[in-house]
Amino acid sequence: MAGYLRAVSSLCRASGSARTWAPAALTVPSWPEQPRRHYAEKRIKVEKPVVEMDGDEMTRIIWQFIKEKLILPHVDVQLKYFDLGLPNRDQTNDQVTIDSALATQKYSVAVKCATITPDEARVEEFKLKKMWKSPNGTIRNILGGTVFREPIICKNIPRLVPGWTKPITIGRHAHGDQYKATDFVVDRAGTFKLVFTPKDGSSAKEWEVYNFPAGGVGMGMYNTDESISGFAHSCFQYSIQKKWPLYLSTKNTILKAYDGRFKDIFQEIFDKHYKTDFDKNKIWYEHRLIDDMVAQVLKSSGGFVWACKNYDGDVQSDILAQGFGSLGLMTSVLVCPDGKTIEAEAAHGTVTRHYREHQKGRPTSTNPIASIFAWTRGLEHRGKLDGNQDLIRFAQTLEKVCVQTVESGAMTKDLAGCIHGLSNVKLNEHFLNTTDFLDTIKSNLDRALGKQ
């Protein structure tokens, strides 16, 4: 199974035993130089490196094409390469994931290919040492920040919500709540209590949650002021960057203390740090109840940032993706509270079903656009940090080429299915296979850049 992976042991540090992450103790490893490639001399020079995180399965194959055919022929950039493919994560005891996050902290920009988060079946398939955690979760825990998902709009791809004529960016607070909760099943009558024991030695506080007359379920969850504050800063900075209004949705009428804390921290930070900039850009910030917000989103035309708690963001981001047409047309960017560190990736997974077909030697029609946008969003941000207008223009041109290619009628099967219905589409009449579609984008990009 690991045969599809390139040998990259020289690029990633191997670790003989599992290691615990401690920021003060770990340093970013040194990398050998990438092998020299022979490209045209008139490439855009990028002064500072970009961290590249490779991935798994079909997206890994597409990722290589994007890098070698669309990016590097036009951009002279040093890539700090990390192989986050599952076999290498297993070989390094997941140290490679930690190292990639620390490198992102150092260089401020990372682009990431989709990766496998193993379950029991994957542990058996890859003969893993253990069921490794989600690499995205590991990276987010080190970097902090907020995951922003935004649709890529193509005029000819029908939207389930036709009124959404402008993008809606959803900012998910990817920390705590249900995803770090302790939940349990009780099988008899008893009392469920929550206890908080202060570190300063003062008296413990106790809350009685429920007296169970019989079996049931319970849960305790948390979040922190520090994490909520980082979430708020990321959202306000992103809104200013996009020049779009920001809405925070909670259910503070029910969770008066828990969700109320989100509402209060956002308002305090807005008033203290961002109100002037929002007024200058003629945008606004509002808190809305989640049920009211969902209704308003459906009635809106788009053009705003929606800040969601962890679970809400998980659910609503998929609703937005389908509402705009396809998960294959959805970008995902992790923005850190410092306002300069980001990690860009596709919002979808590794496309396992297509990879199984690829293993059998059969052609697939896999949509690469979200993976291309991972590169463009990362490079555009690198350009903004470095003041490199040529790099910014290149990234924006490649994005426009992708959209214009689809709007011209050249697309993959998933997008053709949105127009004609999957049961009605035919190869080369309604859609192209993966390679032909990527070749079409390459030709259109070369033409747009005046390379032909």
From Swiss-Prot:
GO cellular component: cytosol; mitochondrial inner membrane; mitochondrion; peroxisome
InterPro entries in the record: IsoCit/isopropylmalate_DH_CS, Isocitrate_DH_NADP, IsoPropMal-DH-like_dom
Organism, as annotated: Mus musculus (Mouse)
Site (Critical for catalysis) location in chain: Y179, K251
UniProt EC number: 1.1.1.42
Binding positions for NADP(+) per the UniProt entry: T115, I116, T117, R122, K299, G349, T350, V351, T352, R353, H354, N367
Gene Ontology molecular functions: isocitrate dehydrogenase (NADP+) activity; magnesium ion binding; NAD binding
Keyword Transit peptide attached: yes
SUPFAM superfamilies referenced in this protein's UniProt entry, alphabetically: Isocitrate/Isopropylmalate dehydrogenase-like
Name used for this protein in its record: Isocitrate dehydrogenase [NADP], mitochondrial
Cofactor names: Mg(2+); Mn(2+)
Post-translational modification summary for this protein: Acetylation at Lys-413 dramatically reduces catalytic activity. Deacetylated by SIRT3.
Catalytic activity: D-threo-isocitrate + NADP(+) = 2-oxoglutarate + CO2 + NADPH
Record's cofactor remark: Binds 1 Mg(2+) or Mn(2+) ion per subunit.
Transit peptide, UniProt annotation: 1-39
Binding site for D-threo-isocitrate: T117, S134, P135, N136, G137, T138, I139, R140, R149, R172
Induction profile: By oxidative stress (at protein level).
Positions carrying N6-acetyllysine: 45, 48, 67, 69, 80, 106, 155, 166, 180, 193, 199, 256, 263, 272, 275, 280, 282, 384, 400, 413, 442
Residues noted as binding Mn(2+) in the record, renumbered to the chain: D291, D314
